[in-house]
Amino acid sequence: MAFVVPAEIGHAPYAGPLLEYMSGHFAFVQIAAVRRKLFPELSEDCWLLYADGFGGKTQHFLLSAIERFSFKDKPPDAGTRVPVAEWRMWHRRLRPFLLSADARGLYQEVARDSVRLGDVARVGIGYVTGANDFFHLRPSEAEQQGISGDLLHPAVRNGKALRGRAITWATVASWRRHDQPNFLLRLTDGRELPAAVRRYLDSQGGRDARTSYKCRNRTPWYVVPDVTEPDAFLSYMSGGTPCLVANQASCVATNSVHVVKLAEGQSITRLQRAWDTPFTQLSCEVEGHPLGGGLLKLEPGEAVRVVIGGKTDQRSAEDRLVQHAVSTMRQWRHYAEGSR
């Protein structure tokens, strides 16, 4: 039997149980990874899944990477033989097998003796307000409502704010100067609410906000939980390498970015220096996954597996191999080199 399947069969959590079942019930399982879109009008990439010999078992998959789909009488003969046991070692993902055997071998060798992000930091999501536009105010709105500045906390609302090496007090001052809605109304339970805040909560915007799922399922509805001031922020969607930006202004962040809390004794400067290495760029590609439109997505569980600053000689064939591997993975997610 044969199916057209989403290309996320190469990385999605559901692909693990599916391919485990296929390997345990078919004598032959082949995946044809098609780099150029099968259906150009769709944002979804598609691959082909072929299985034969129902009732049998197999200890390997055949992954055939092809540039462009064309109609043929039978599946491609050539491909990479992927042992099921080795596929499991790669977190039951097929995407790493788009790389050459040399690149995979180097990745495993370097990663084995290197530190991963989860060894030096905790990575989580930011807070969820349930009504972002209501809980984030512009300075002019706060002034108009009579809400005191000490109740407003500078906030990173999305990845667009992650520019440069750090968010500084100058960054926050720029938000104020440009009257941007980057200030969270940060209220705490048990604190008496000023009259101006009560009026704001009882406004039409407040009445609408409290009907949202998140707001109506917390008490009190206007206290946003899980608000933290991390050491850094990490973009979870990116074109090139995800941005790791230091938090020098005690900002907080929504769940549109990841929050990074360093372990004791760790330095954000050292971490950023390591983050910029080619090997870490490759690790982001290997541990993350395509989102569509050329974007790379890095979930918290994927981010903690990213290898930090794996060392290869920058003048060596190893470094050239890493650079080529990064380029290969980006081509498969249709990332246009030179954009970011």
Regions found by a protein language model. Name each.
Residues 339:
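Acidic, carboxylate-rich catalytic segments that either coordinate divalent cations
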Residues 1-134:
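Signature of N6-adenine DNA methyltransferases within the class I
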Residues 96-316, 320-336:
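Polybasic, glycine- and aromatic-enriched phosphate-binding surface used to engage nucleic acids
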